[in-house]
Regions:
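A short acidic/basic microdomain associated with nuclease active sites
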Residues: 89, 93-107
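Structural detector for short beta-strands of small beta-barrel domains
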Residues: 3-13
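OB-fold/S1-family single-stranded nucleic acid-binding modules
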Residues: 56-73
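Short nucleic-acid-contacting surface segments enriched for D/E, G, S/T with interspersed K/R
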Residues: 37-50
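Short alpha-helix capping/helix-loop boundary micro-motifs
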Residues: 29-39
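Conserved catalytic cores of phosphodiester-cleaving nucleases, focusing on short active-site segments
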Residues: 9, 112-142, 155
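Short, charged beta-turn/beta-strand-edge "cap" motif at the junction between a beta-strand
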Residues: 13, 53-58
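Short aromatic-glycine-enriched beta-strand elements
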Residues: 16-21
Length: 155
């Protein structure tokens, strides 16, 4: 997976889940944030971020916020990147020989990111990206949501 037209910037503020203010080449730009999670541990005023310049002249914003520098690590903020990277990895043989690779597959009442056959068995794969980091440990999700909380059968 590769990003083109990347430029560094300084994160200033995030007024809502969808946009951020970033200083790029001496100008304050409103950029689209490709991750609606809170990301408070990463998007700290003054941190270095990496933005991708859009090639679409009719867009409201010229840039997408793609990644945040934290220490010596670059943390991807693009919520679509994990599935794209996993799909490329599977298609290139990362899991060995598989067939019938499909994305966004419904099975019963659930939807899975990928389905494929491995050694004649149907497999399902759910991919998660992590933006919550604490002392080198990544976690998912970065905040609780109603879809992540379910009653325990032992209660």
């Amino acid at each position: 997976m590769r990003y083109d037209n990347m430029t560094p910037g300084i994160f200033l503020a995030r007024p809502n889940r969808f946009i951020a203010h970033v200083e790029i080449e001496g100008q304050t730009e409103i950029v689209h944030v490709k991750n609606t999670g809170r990301c408070r541990e990463l998007l700290v005023p003054g941190c270095t971020v990496w933005c991708q310049r859009s090639t679409n002249p009719s867009r409201k914003t010229k840039f997408d916020l793609i990644a945040v520098q934290k220490g010596d690590r670059l943390i991807n903020m693009d919520s679509q990147a994990p599935n794209q990277a996993a799909g490329e990895w599977l298609a290139s043989g990362g899991l060995g020989e598989i067939t019938e690779l499909r994305a966004e597959v419904k099975h019963g009442d659930s939807r899975y990111d990928f389905s494929f056959l491995k050694d004649g068995k149907r497999c399902f794969l759910e991919v998660k990206g992590c933006t919550l980091e604490d002392d080198g440990v990544c976690a998912f999700p970065d905040e609780l949501s109603n879809t992540m909380v379910s009653p325990s059968p032992t209660r």
